[in-house]
């Protein structure tokens, strides 16, 4: 029994949800998203709530039950409020700036790193040491933030690099004399 899967997903106000077989479509003020559920689960729209049930009691069906429910909840929240991920840059000379739609990062390399913003994602740089990635697709926002962080992840000795705003870097002690 999936604890997450058995909870019905409430459709928020201002969002219209449509279930067509295995395809769940959500349309809201921020845009439109869809999710195609696996054949192991059944999806129904009842009284402004989306109910996900496993087709049978196989282990595979139970595993996809909770995941499908969470994905549907994510698209409903995304089209209403959207998602954002904040990144911080630490280090002398490390900074970020926007050049048109591209993000330019100075991260201590011999060249600046230019990251092209994908479709459906908005990147903002309120301060040279702060990056805000936002969009309606939770997976895509997280992936873009992870790709930016990957250019120069935080190192444990001085804490230099790109890190998530809520991330805590465990610092190591330097070598002793």
From Swiss-Prot:
Encoding gene (name): rplF
Family: Belongs to the universal ribosomal protein uL6 family.
Protein task: This protein binds to the 23S rRNA, and is important in its secondary structure. It is located near the subunit interface in the base of the L7/L12 stalk, and near the tRNA binding site of the peptidyltransferase center.
Name of protein: Large ribosomal subunit protein uL6
Keyword entries, A-Z: Ribonucleoprotein, Ribosomal protein, RNA-binding, rRNA-binding
PANTHER family in the record: 60S/50S RIBOSOMAL PROTEIN L6/L9, LARGE RIBOSOMAL SUBUNIT PROTEIN UL6M
InterPro entries in UniProt: Ribosomal_uL6-like, Ribosomal_uL6-like_a/b-dom_sf, Ribosomal_uL6_a/b-dom, Ribosomal_uL6_bac-type, Ribosomal_uL6_CS
Subunit details: Part of the 50S ribosomal subunit.
GO cellular component: cytosolic large ribosomal subunit
GO molecular function per UniProt: rRNA binding; structural constituent of ribosome
GO biological process, alphabetically ordered: cytoplasmic translation
Gene source species: Sinorhizobium medicae (strain WSM419) (Ensifer medicae)
Phylogenetic classification of the source organism: Bacteria, Pseudomonadati, Pseudomonadota, Alphaproteobacteria, Hyphomicrobiales
